[in-house]
């Protein structure tokens, strides 16, 4: 998923992504990716990961556990995700945070599996700390703006620049921004400030017209 910019859609456990509705989201995302020439990744609810793996999309898990293959009932194991066609995972999302030690273990583990790591952080200090492990992406998301409809690029624009500076020494790590992103204007501002892509959730999945929302964000990246 090295091509920039990238749009990651986190479906969380929203009912709007349940059942057959994930198929509509995946089709809309694949269509927008082809039309606008941007990379789009979808992170469906964990039990629906297999439902979208056949689409022309990058599929990410919303969370992984630092557990091994074998007798680890209920845990999400990176190796098995890779065997199932999943391309990578979000790590340390604000709704499912893990320890710094787990990040330090999981990022190189995904790298060894040729899988994508997207490490979520709440501020530039955490970005600096966790970028030392050289994940593919650091996603800056102030928790107070997540799901608020108030975008980080308009409410906290300085944070994007600070985070970009914080990860500058992490070779190969790209910055994403999330929290409150709902419009093409939000996307364009974030890219101007140094972000290489967007992590979005409710702004797409809970939109009255998810396909139109995806198209607007993708077009702003093209």
From Swiss-Prot:
What is one Gene Ontology biological process annotated in the Swiss-Prot or TrEMBL record?
gluconeogenesis
A family per Pfam: TIM
Where does the UniProt entry say this protein principally localizes?
Answer: cytoplasm
- Which InterPro entries is this protein grouped with? Aldolase_TIM, TIM_sf, Triosephosphate_isomerase, Triosephosphate_isomerase_arc
What's a single GO CC term here?
Answer: cytoplasm
Q: Which residues bind substrate?
A: 10-12, 146, 180, 201-202
Q: Which pairs of Cys residues are joined through disulfide bonds in the record?
A: none
* UniProt protein name: Triosephosphate isomerase
The record's SUPFAM superfamilies line, in alphabetical order, gives:
Triosephosphate isomerase (TIM) (SSF51351)
The gene for this chain is tpiA
